[in-house]
A protein has these predicted regions:
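A general structural-boundary detector
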Residues: 20, 145-148, 182, 207, ...
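Short catalytic-loop micro-motif centered on adjacent basic/acidic residues
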Residues: 19-23, 81-82, 103, 204-207, ...
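Active-site proximal loops enriched in glycine and acidic residues that flank catalytic Cys/His/Asp
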Residues: 173, 208-210, 232
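Extended, intrinsically disordered, low-complexity segments
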Residues: 246-289
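A short N-terminal beta->alpha junction/helix N-cap motif
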Residues: 17-25, 50-54, 261, 265
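Metal-dependent phosphohydrolase cores
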Residues: 21, 199, 213, 259
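Alpha/beta enzyme core
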Residues: 3-11, 15, 27-52, 59-76, ...
Length: 289
């Protein structure tokens, strides 16, 4: 059974750890994430971008697949199925499809319109007991064709959005999607601290978790980050393991071309990456606390 992310993030906030959101892109990704969470006894948030949802034949297909896999694999840890960087229309599609959590990315709207739409969605989600994530200040890099410059959020605007009844808040603090450039200036902990002071107990979300040094991750958690998103790192791990398999000629050995064998190294690499992140975030063993 899927659950809202609200309760798991409240526990993470109180326990000074973070829950990982690991984006899924197909069956292998989903299975790897679920099995690793169960092995680690960690709560998990499965993220689905609108592009990934379209690739997997629609949000209902994704929701039905996740629910069926949880039942078949006997998954007992808390699992939230979360729309990542959702448009206004996309949020309603995911609500209808059976997602348990959504993110409305209104960061590209003027703050007044962001407030209006977020407030509306907060009311809808509260009535359905779904969790809602909002964003202030665009996250750098590219996500499904939307390019953000990575500016820092205004703490006062964060307070404005947090007071609308959302369950978690993503705020730009110099983080970006994808690989970080060599000249990246690092996370703005001063901005994060100001945001935390104004938003109180609100769980904060760190997007672009790939490539951020471990010490920065731990400091961000200390300053109130309770959810960390990881996508690119799993993709890179999958690609590298698959490349090695093919370059070693394994696909030409016996029935090594069978997709179930061909995709296995990449699957294992995703599992290893997720486990490594759960250990870093401190969520291992926290599923039933």
């Amino acid at each position: 059974m899927l659950v809202s992310a609200a309760e798991m993030l409240k526990k993470a906030k109180a326990g000074h750890y973070a829950v990982g959101q690991f984006n899924i892109n197909n069956m292998e990704w989903t299975k790897a994430a679920l099995l690793t969470a169960e092995e680690c006894k960690s709560p998990i948030i499965l993220g689905v971008s609108e592009g990934a949802g379209k690739y997997m034949c629609g949000f209902k297909t994704v929701a039905d697949m996740v629910k069926a896999m949880m039942e078949e694999l006997n998954i007992t840890v808390p699992v939230a199925l979360h729309l990542d960087h959702g448009t206004y229309d996309g949020c309603y599609k995911c609500i209808k499809a059976g997602f348990s959590s959504i993110m409305f990315d209104g960061s590209h709207y003027p703050i007044e319109e962001n407030v209006e739409k977020t407030k509306e969605l907060a009311g809808v989600c509260k009535g359905l007991r779904l969790s809602l994530e909002a964003e202030v200040g665009s996250i750098g890099g590219e996500e499904d064709g939307v390019v953000g410059m990575g500016e820092c959020a205004d703490p006062k605007e964060c307070k404005m959005i947090a007071d609308l009844g959302v369950d978690m808040l993503a705020a730009g603090i110099g983080n970006i999607h994808g690989k970080y450039p060599e000249n990246w200036g690092g996370l703005r902990f001063d901005v994060l601290d100001d945001i935390q002071k104004l938003t109180g107990e609100m769980p904060l979300v760190l997007h672009g978790g790939t490539g951020i040094p471990a010490d920065m991750i731990k400091k961000a958690i200390d300053l109130g980050v309770s959810k960390i998103n990881v996508n690119t790192e799993c993709q890179l791990s999958f690609a590298e393991a698959t490349r090695k398999y093919i370059e070693a000629g394994k696909d030409n050995e016996g029935k090594g071309y069978d997709p179930r064998k061909l995709l296995k190294p990449g699957f294992d690499a995703i599992c290893d990456t997720i486990k490594e992140k759960m250990e870093l975030f401190g969520s291992v063993g926290k599923a039933f606390e």
